[in-house]
């Protein structure tokens, strides 16, 4: 059957491997998620920066928002890495692929905190988190070339110490809040704000690794061969 192939694949790592190898595509340009994948020995064949509307729906629960956005990111990447067969109209791929997408939502109760775009927004996030417990909802989604899609949700609980004005001002000055859900990075200076954490630490950073491993295994991605080099 005749297939129209997207030129996106030209000069990419996808062309450097055999058709039998499953290609891992990360639907995120987040340096934190790339670093977490590298921590478990994974280097995606492609990194695709998705551009979707992340505005919460009216009265949408933070957990549902995380799951919806992770799924939408995977489906957005699917539009690039799969193409329609002219005869059947179905989306197909000449490669075996697994698209991995994730989203992180920080919330106090049902109040969703943004990824602040200004120091004022970041200050309000820190002030709101000061001395309180909050939830970090992490959703990870896998989608393969056959259209099989699975979403896993992870919930972590984090409590901040009471933050003084000098603490918040110094953290804002560091710039570490930029691009971070809830306006902080637990793996950075804000780790000194955390007095308690329950659940997955890697989820708070940006990608729940245990659940990611489970998903990739379920999609027959040979994760362990990246550790031991064995093919069987």
UniProtKB/Swiss-Prot annotation:
Gene Ontology cellular component terms for the protein in this record? cytoplasm
Which catalytic reaction applies to this protein? dTTP + H2O = dTMP + diphosphate + H(+); UTP + H2O = UMP + diphosphate + H(+)
Where is this chain primarily localised?
cytoplasm
InterPro entries the record matches: ITPase-like_fam (IPR029001), Maf-like (IPR003697)
The cellular location(s) given in this protein's UniProt record come to: Cytoplasm
Q: Which residues form the active site?
A: 103
Q: What does this protein do?
A: Nucleoside triphosphate pyrophosphatase that hydrolyzes dTTP and UTP. May have a dual role in cell division arrest and in preventing the incorporation of modified nucleotides into cellular nucleic acids.
The name under which this protein is listed is dTTP/UTP pyrophosphatase
The species this protein belongs to is Bartonella henselae (strain ATCC 49882 / DSM 28221 / CCUG 30454 / Houston 1) (Rochalimaea henselae)
């Amino acid at each position: 059957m005749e297939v129209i192939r997207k030129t996106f694949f030209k000069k990419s790592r996808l062309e450097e491997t055999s058709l039998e190898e499953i290609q891992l595509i990360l639907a995120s340009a987040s340096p934190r998620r790339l670093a977490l994948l590298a921590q478990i020995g994974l280097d995606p064949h492609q990194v695709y920066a998705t551009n979707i509307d992340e505005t919460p729906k009216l009265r949408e629960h933070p957990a549902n928002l995380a799951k919806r956005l992770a799924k939408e990111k995977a489906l957005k990447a699917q539009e690039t890495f799969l193409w329609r067969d002219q005869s059947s109209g179905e989306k197909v791929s000449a490669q075996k692929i697994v698209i991995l997408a994730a989203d992180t939502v920080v919330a106090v109760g049902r109040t969703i905190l943004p990824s602040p775009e200004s120091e004022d927004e970041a200050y309000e996030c820190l002030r709101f988190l000061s001395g309180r417990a909050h939830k970090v909802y992490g959703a990870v989604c896998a989608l393969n070339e056959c259209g099989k899609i699975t979403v896993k949700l992870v919930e972590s609980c984090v409590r901040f110490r009471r933050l003084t004005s000098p603490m918040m001002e110094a953290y804002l000055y560091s710039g570490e809040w930029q691009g971070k859900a809830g306006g902080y990075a637990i793996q950075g200076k804000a780790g000194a704000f955390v007095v308690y954490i329950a659940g997955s630490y890697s989820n708070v950073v940006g990608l729940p690794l245990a659940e990611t491993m489970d998903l990739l295994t379920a999609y027959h991605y040979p994760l362990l061969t990246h550790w031991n080099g064995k093919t069987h």
